[in-house]
Amino acid sequence: MKNIFWKRERIEIMTALALFNYVFLGAEYLFDNMMAFQTDSGGVVLAQSYVLGSSTVGFLLFGVLDGKMRERAKKAGSAGAGVLAAVCLWMIQVHQSYGSTLAAGLILYVLLGIAGSLVHYRAACRYGMEEHLAETVGVSYAIGLFLQFLENNLIHNAAVEAVILTVAFWALLFLVEKRKVAGSLMERNLYESDPIRHPYAAAVTLIFTVALMTCIFATLDNAVTLGHAGGSMDIGQWPRLILAVSGLVSGVLFDYGKGRYRNLIMYCVTLLSTVCILVIVSGGSFLLGLIVFYLSAGFFVVFFSTGCVRLAGYMRVPQFWAGMGRAVNNLCAILIGSFSVALIRSGDSTKIMIASIGLFVLISIAIYIYTVMGQTEVELPDQERKQKEEQDYFSAFADTYALTEREQEVLK
């Protein structure tokens, strides 16, 4: 695996993905800290959901613009995005007012959405059908989180953080420009040789599954963010390492058996997260909920990222689908942000339990449908080949012993 996995091209793609994860999460952490100077913990959670939701615009915008813009316009847009991102990060760390900080966050995450969709498309073009796709995504996610962990523990100045995030974003743009892909997917022949039975149905059910799972994980995330904004914990410390480990482990587990157990593993992780919510609302340990959240969140990110990167090659506009997982996740986060905060603050354990169990039932149905629709058609050729081999063996046996047609019918 070492010779196959650790190649320069894959390392560059993983570095770009890692930088995206680092900037995306690092900017979110910086935004939360700066917004805490302007509003209470509930306001921070709502503002965070707004900026994360705005990234959905960027993810979808890339799929629309990539095929229409000329090469010179793309280069100019990339340079402009780098400058605008630097301005937005500086405005966030200044946090002059609630409105200016929120506006800078909204613009920044639109840019991050475009960059994220671009880097996921690059990954789909080269590694969408690779055996180690989930490991590639998982390692990148873990590296990005580890970089953020180092920044949080070594850098304690908002201005310096903004500068570092800006440089990382510029490096990300440089790498994705370096790994350009001409025309459609370069490895489309691999997709044609291993077709999914119902690719668009699988894509729709995957989106529906991610949307439902987001309701579970976003609720846990909001509960943790409320504690962070309120000062009861610092989510930039050791919990981030748990998240990094879960990203690594999920990548290995999802690729085990050529990915055939990926949906089952994610189903079990979702069950664990649902139980965790029920334990917390019943008065259980919040620390336990924090640990389970970070363990499961890494699995969730690698799951939807891998699923959409793989499906992109089967679509007519792969640029639109490669980053769809993150787009759906962030859009659902903004849609349920205020509702989940109100539900958590209400302390109504009965409503929370009913909502959690209902969501889990829907997730179970969605995962089953996605598994069926996402199956490839490789089993049928193998079965036909086996039948042909058996027929050839029987024909050779009949010729050897000079069996009559009647004797052959009896033996069959």
Per-range role (PLM):
Residues K2-Q48, D194-L220, I291-L295:
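Pair of pore-lining "gating" transmembrane helices in MFS-fold secondary transporters
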Residues L112-Y127, G298-R316:
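Intracellular juxtamembrane helix-capping segments at the cytosolic ends
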